Amino acid sequence: MNFPDTPVCEMPFFRGDLRDSNHCAFSKSTCIYLLFEPLRYSCIRLIVMFICVAMITCPNSLRFSQYTFLRSYLTLPSCAYFDFLGTHTSRLKLTPVHIPILVLQRKNNRAYPSDMIYDTCTLDFLFRNLCLHKSCSYVWGQIQSSRRFYRKIDHLA
């Protein structure tokens, strides 16, 4: 199934302040389009839209236990995820998030999962502090449903 080329927040049913790039929290890879398309021209669509936008833009609603992951990304379709390093990265930089960040360490020219770090920050801060370890080669921010590759650690100061 193909995704629309236009970011969801720039589609016709997003109006007013939501068209501001700082509020454009969704990229074409989030499948949000699939959520709203069946609800076109309905009150349900508007309710769902405002709930989703509120959950994305309000950091308090994104807080969750260190022992759990976001469940299917805030109950959205399982294919929904943030493409942090994708083409719409600039739209997400100012969005407050409380998200698991997987730090990969490079060993023998291969990247291995290292540690999970949970913190509340903005993506702008994240992008300016990508290298959290000296051996860190890549920070992967995509939300995953599987836990078996990760281990819990304390917050790094």
Swiss-Prot record:
**Regions crossing the membrane:** 42-64
Q: What Gene Ontology cellular-component terms does the record carry?
A: membrane
Main localisation: membrane
The membrane topology of this protein is: Single-pass membrane protein
Protein's cellular compartments: Membrane
> Which keywords has UniProt assigned to this entry?
Membrane, Transmembrane, Transmembrane helix
The organism's superkingdom is given as Eukaryota
More about this protein? Partially overlaps DUS3.
Q: What is this protein called?
A: Putative uncharacterized protein YLR400W
